[in-house]
């Protein structure tokens, strides 16, 4: 079974480097391999909006690879239909990263195309993605208004020409995403879960989790992403379909996840969006770690979708440690209360389950 590495922090560059060191990525890559890095540059927005991959993920990945002696490195991507890839690249600072490390960036909107037979139908895929010896997928874990979640598998859609992207939507997204994952399987996935959007692919409601993941199975990574977001696999049907078509496995056992450190606080975070402010109006946060707070926000959002009534007052954060609490507490720091959700951090589904019990 594949292993997932999980790390918390605020520096995307060093977190990426540490993940790759821990996983001994250099031993996975054949000598002289051509390595293609595929981030998420869906649109011309900065990563703090929750839509695109942080430039530090890219720089950390490149620096690790170059220090290990790999030189045939490129960055490949295309923005979504209607946006300009070069503009998106500059908005995220990728032009500066590529210039610093001497790595070329290829706009896949301008790439050659090859037709590949998939379990669904023939599909047009860009040649640079297909021909890479070692494809590294660098997605953002975030919500999506049509598929509930987007991460490793859906990020591969950026390896398609625009006309094929349009077909994906006319086909309903689910089956084509699964089919693509079975024929264009990345060798490595490094997930930017630093501040992914709550529910929209294009950003605007970022939730600070300060977390990153690394794995070698995109299906397993997406299944774990569902767990982190409080979603069931059934909520994101392309994941199990991709498993059926041979893209990977959804199985995750306890020893499949290596957590490299614990979440800590100490960063200055972007101001909460209007939606997040509304969701958390009854929350009293005192020195709450970002991962714990993000799990609560996600659970509050899911509760709203279900029409659940949530407590008028919820407490969360390190300053509640050792204190008697009469309200619902979130996380181990709030264990002084009669009613609290265990975990460091607790999962969104555990918090949501408590909301259901109290309704």
Where do the model's predicted regions map?
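N-terminal and secondary-structure boundary signal
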Residues: 1-359
